[in-house]
Amino acid sequence: VVYESSPYFAGTGSDSAQYFWNVRQELDADPSERAKMPPIQRRGKRPVISNSQTRAWVPYGFIVVHSSAPGTGLSQGCPTVGTRIEALAPKAVIDWLNGRAKGFTTPDGNEEVKAFWSTGRVGMIGTSYNGTIPFAAATTGVKGLEAIIPVSPNNSYYHYYRSNGLVRSPGGYLGEDVDVLYDFIHSNPDNCEYCDSVYKRSVMQARHDRRSGDYNEFWAERDLMNYVDDFRAATLMAHRFNDWNVMISQ
């Protein structure tokens, strides 16, 4: 089984600079308010949420499986951008593909769906955010995840959004931060108001610290290098040296 998980399958928000942070801010000063990004018009319906990877792998006899990351598309929960939730969600899918977890046709239904067609041997693949998720899944040590191919993955959100105690912006996205990425991927309109209140404002904007840019518990939770003790999947990783968005040091 070739498995790709993504926060992008159901659509994305605006990349207009008017919804990013104002970078003209002095160190140790409170940032100015950021304009709210318009809601995302969710696209995609079950059972087909993406055709990614199908042409590359299905002709060779592989089954391709897709899932939307937590808080995106038809997935439940809130987008947490880099926490253990994004590792445990694909782990649950792999557990289902191996018959260790139950799946149902609806979140609150009782009609079970079994992956009778799965051998239980899973490989994950993806680029950028879609490449970070396989790495995160592999840190759980889940049985059945045999190999991953992450292309330009981001394994540390601190190094993506901060640099040696300073706030930085990924290449090409001046003023972006972890809460901006949250808005960009939050394509589940059913949970937007709730998640904005209990997670974006109460956790992300309260703790990501645009005043100093220092490393703290918020960023430590989003550093995959802190969770590699159980990593067991064979890995083929690719990265460009001149990538100024997700840099090789991340």
Feature annotation, model-predicted:
Residues 44-47, 73-92, 101:
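Catalytic nucleophile-loop/oxyanion-hole region of alpha/beta-hydrolase
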Residues 2-7, 66, 96:
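Structural cue for short, hydrophobic secondary-structure segments
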Residues 7-43, 47-55, 59, 87, ...:
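Accessory cap/linker subdomain of secreted extracellular hydrolases
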